[in-house]
Amino acid sequence: MSFDTIIQFENASIFIHDHLVLKEVNFTINKSEFVYLIGKVGSGKTSLIKTMNAELPLLEGEATIAGFILHHIKPRQIPYLRRKLGIVFQDFQLLIDRSVNENLMFVLKATGWNNKKDIDRRISEVLEKVGLQHKGYKMPHQLSGGEQQRVVIARALLNDPEIILADEPTGNLDPETSEGIMNILSEISQSGRAVVMATHNYNLLNKFRARTMKCQEGRLIELENREIDFAALEE
């Protein structure tokens, strides 16, 4: 594994309980890489992301992510792994009874931050990165869908993760708002973090070109870097 490699899977099999979802999974992802995961519903995209997050155990094969060996990881190590990962999902999962600032403060305190000045500074930093520096006082219901997803991205950045795992982050958003989210994720990748994004939105895939892997018939296939054939992808 090279110095720049941040994720590596070797001959891995991905399971949900006893059900084999993907087999012979082999790939590496480097720092600053942006990688799409595509495929039909149920093809294994989310299961692969959950394996990276140690939500699903790696039962066969080998994998290393952010310096943690997934096939040997112990339960007490999982919280430390997850501090190196920023998670962005389609459903925003914000605490609806707390303001934006309070949502972010909750995560920081839960991960060991206790100095108020440091907490306030970090919240300001991540909100500025996503263009919401003046929205910290608002409640989630006062924000648009795109703004709520920006808060989720800000939340994912709080502990300065090495990797962003995004599962359908634009799934509930209109095209213009989706492009804004993609611009933010692209900037995050350019800042040195790896970004892995599962998506069905092939229009974004075509507009924001990046390395693409497809879950298909129980395998993970690397697609050539060429003009994307939408009809072929839908098969």
Summary of predicted features, one role per range:
Residues 139-143, 147:
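Conserved ABC ATPase signature
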Residues 158-162:
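A short, proline-enriched helix->beta-strand linker immediately N-terminal to the Walker B motif
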Residues 61-69:
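Conserved ABC transporter NBD signature motif
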Residues 97-106:
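Short coil-to-helix segment of the ABC ATPase nucleotide-binding domain corresponding to the Q-loop/switch region
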Residues 53:
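Helix-to-loop junction immediately C-terminal to a conserved catalytic motif
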Residues 175-177:
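Helix N-cap at the start of a conserved alpha-helix in ABC-type nucleotide-binding domains
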Residues 164-167:
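Catalytic Walker B motif of ABC-type/P-loop ATPase nucleotide-binding domains
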